[in-house]
Amino acid sequence: MRKAIFPGSFDPLTLGHSDIIKRSIPLFDEIIIAIGVNAEKKYMFSLEDRKRFIKETFKDEPSVSVISYEGLTIDLCKKLGADFILRGLRNPADFEFEKAIAHTNRRLSKIETIFLLTAASTSFISSSIVRDVIRNGGDYSVLVPEAVRVK
């Protein structure tokens, strides 16, 4: 069985995240959206809200599930029997950052990282940009799935 972990904070889930997940469904038997929890980090949306956004967005996709975790992603992969880490790439800076992590993960384990390029229509979207638009009272509805719009 081809099982992938898609890790992130998803604060909040964006159309970019959603696009990567949708496009990965035919590639894997199971996709686990893994929300990383870091006690040192301040989040705009609660963990429960972030889980709800993802569950609602993918409610009709039985191969997609959501969990939260702490610690190393490769440890989570080993625990859940996942052989792949799924990552989206928006730009060259993402690639350089993700490449270093992928090489480290590969050195520490046998887990492969699979990169998908974001669609041109969503390549400019990041959770940071969405949070900034929200903080400044802007219309963020064109940047996020429907489930996030009705917070």
Swiss-Prot record:
One of its GO terms (biological process) is coenzyme A biosynthetic process. Its EC number is 2.7.7.3. Substrate binds at S9, K41, T73, R87. The keyword Ion transport does not apply. Signal peptide: none annotated. The record marks H17 as: Transition state stabilizer. Pathway: Cofactor biosynthesis; coenzyme A biosynthesis; CoA from (R)-pantothenate: step 4/5. ATP binds at S9, F10, H17, G88, L89, R90, E98, T122, S123, F124, I125, S126, S127, S128. Its cofactor is Mg(2+). Keywords: ATP-binding, Coenzyme A biosynthesis, Cytoplasm, Magnesium, Nucleotide-binding, Nucleotidyltransferase, Transferase. It catalyses: (R)-4'-phosphopantetheine + ATP + H(+) = 3'-dephospho-CoA + diphosphate. GO terms for molecular function: ATP binding; pantetheine-phosphate adenylyltransferase activity. Pfam families: CTP_transf_like. One of its GO terms (cellular component) is cytoplasm. It comes from the Bacteria. InterPro entries: Cyt_trans-like, PPAT, Rossmann-like_a/b/a_fold. It is found in: Cytoplasm. It is an enzyme of class 2 (transferase). HAMAP family: PPAT_bact (MF_00151). Reversibly transfers an adenylyl group from ATP to 4'-phosphopantetheine, yielding dephospho-CoA (dPCoA) and pyrophosphate. Homohexamer. Belongs to the bacterial CoaD family. This is Phosphopantetheine adenylyltransferase. It comes from Flavobacterium psychrophilum (strain ATCC 49511 / DSM 21280 / CIP 103535 / JIP02/86). The gene is coaD.
